[in-house]
Amino acid sequence: MAAEPGGWLGPALGLRLLLATALQMVSAFGAEFSSESCRELGFSSNLLCGSCDLLGQFDLLQLDPDCRGCCQEEAQFETKKLYAGAILEVCGUKLGRFPQVQAFVRSDKPKLFRGLQIKYVRGSDPVLKLLDDNGNIAEELSILKWNTDSVEEFLSEKLQRV
């Protein structure tokens, strides 16, 4: 019994094909491929899922299901730990040997950071001490070779701005 054009078999077959394709796509999105399968598909074992988001920019959306099956979720960034304060220790007589640190100390930039103190300690090379909530030293870093921008950027990440 052959199906005539416009008969019931044509739409039913089309619907079945559409349903099968949809199921195949859904299973591909949920599947994680083995590392060997991913290599065969041309994906790196270090593929991050964020890279799959970029496929659309290059008209490569047909690769998205395989990409999602091979990718690894990116690790969530740690929340930034802000310190209660910091002490920048430097010897006034040695400050001229560290012009970048001198430029930072003598500028208005230290006033931008809550809890930052500048202490002049005789004979001390430039050191940054980060303080915990109790005022204890949590970290101590030599900033001998840091430039002004590095000091400011680091403090921006570690202290609250005023």
Curated annotation (Swiss-Prot):
It is found in: Endoplasmic reticulum lumen. Residues 1-28 form the signal peptide. It comes from the Eukaryota. GO terms for molecular function: oxidoreductase activity. Keywords: Endoplasmic reticulum, Selenocysteine, Signal. The keyword Endoplasmic reticulum applies. It holds the Pfam family Sep15_SelM. One of its GO terms (cellular component) is endoplasmic reticulum lumen. Forms a tight complex with UGGT1/UGCGL1. Interacts with UGGT2/UGCGL2. Interacts with RDH11. May be involved in redox reactions associated with the formation of disulfide bonds. May contribute to the quality control of protein folding in the endoplasmic reticulum. May regulate protein folding by enhancing the catalytic activity of UGGT1/UGCGL1 and UGGT2/UGCGL2. Belongs to the selenoprotein M/F family. This is Selenoprotein F. It comes from Sus scrofa (Pig).
